[in-house]
Swiss-Prot record:
Residues carrying Phosphoserine: 5
Role according to the record: Preferentially catalyzes the dephosphorylation of 'Ser-5' within the tandem 7 residue repeats in the C-terminal domain (CTD) of the largest RNA polymerase II subunit POLR2A. Negatively regulates RNA polymerase II transcription, possibly by controlling the transition from initiation/capping to processive transcript elongation. Recruited by REST to neuronal genes that contain RE-1 elements, leading to neuronal gene silencing in non-neuronal cells.
CDD domains assigned: HAD_FCP1-like (cd07521)
Subcellular localization(s) per the UniProt record: Nucleus
SMART domains cross-referenced by the UniProt entry: CPDc
Keyword Protein biosynthesis: no
Cofactor: Mg(2+)
Protein name: Carboxy-terminal domain RNA polymerase II polypeptide A small phosphatase 2
Organism: Mus musculus (Mouse)
UniProt xrefs under InterPro entries: Dullard_phosphatase, FCP1_dom, HAD-like_sf, HAD_sf, RNA_Pol_CTD_Phosphatase, TIM50
Catalytic activity: O-phospho-L-seryl-[protein] + H2O = L-seryl-[protein] + phosphate; O-phospho-L-threonyl-[protein] + H2O = L-threonyl-[protein] + phosphate
Gene: Ctdsp2
Length: 270
């Protein structure tokens, strides 16, 4: 098994291309993050919406209404199906988290950056066994990750969901999440492999999608549920990055909503 198959990462050159195309937000140490993050989110699926809008002009008003109704019904059926015991990825909601929004948080290039090459200022060095040989993984923590996770744990039911393998991601999360913010951890086997990408299907969690949000640096990860997503720029080693710090007030605003679709839609509005 190759090193690259253990950790699922964004490439630095891909992140630069996406940033230039407006597919992800770019943080600035001088400006607080506000509603602009959600404008970036809309850009992620601009092409998809253009295709849909061009074809929708051929629909009658009645057909459009039926399409919306079918979409709502499908979402409802998916949610009800995963309420059947043993079919959902997450355990029952604890008493502590009753009524809270479930926030699904990615690991690599969202909270940390890891490398098999030595990093002088690594926050963690994690041994990972690959085909009988132990390799060292050097892990950098994104700036303000501790403050971000602490606040998220106070407000939400937090779930780690990574496309990396558990043999790497589990020990990294042990070191990163000292306070036990994550109620559950999901790894690659919980993803859906779709068109060459590991997709995090939120409908399989067993949570109401109206009260579920995903934070991820890869739009492909949430392609099934773009309207539940808060995008974040891929992080590699910029120690001046303030993305997580600037996201705290955004999530504080979301924490009191009963419908993330409505709240995220309002925040995306110009």
């Amino acid at each position: 098994m190759e090193h690259g198959s253990i950790i699922t990462q964004a490439r630095r050159e891909d992140a630069l291309v996406l940033t230039k195309q407006g597919l992800v937000s770019k943080s600035s140490p001088k400006k607080p993050r506000g509603r602009s993050i959600f404008k970036a989110l809309l850009c992620c699926f601009h092409t998809q919406h253009v295709v849909q809008s061009s074809s929708s002009t051929e629909l009658t008003h009645k057909e459009e209404a039926n399409t919306i109704a079918k979409s709502d019904l499908l979402q409802c059926l998916q949610y009800q199906f995963y309420q059947i015991p043993g079919t959902c990825l997450l355990p029952e909601v604890t008493e502590q988290d009753q009524g809270r929004i479930c926030v699904v948080i990615d690991l690599d290039e969202t909270l940390v950056h890891s490398s098999f090459k030595p990093i002088n200022n690594a926050d963690f060095i994690v041994p990972v066994e690959i085909e009988g040989t132990t390799h060292q993984v050097y892990v950098l923590k994104r700036p303000y990750v501790d403050e971000f996770l602490r606040r998220m744990g106070e407000l939400f039911e937090c779930v780690l969901f990574t496309a990396s393998l558990a043999k790497y991601a589990d020990p990294v999360t042990d070191l990163l999440d000292r306070c036990g913010v994550f109620r559950a951890r999901l790894f690659r086997e919980a993803c859906v492999f779709h068109q060459g990408c590991y997709v995090k299907d939120l409908s399989r969690l067993g949570r109401d999608l109206r009260k579920t949000v995903i934070l991820d640096n890869s739009p492909a990860s949430y392609i099934f549920h773009p309207e539940n997503a808060v995008p974040v720029q891929s992080w590699f080693d910029d120690m001046a990055d303030t993305e997580l710090l600037n996201l705290i007030p955004v999530f504080e605003e979301l924490s009191g909503t009963d419908d993330v679709y409505t709240s995220l839609g309002q925040l995306r509005a110009p």
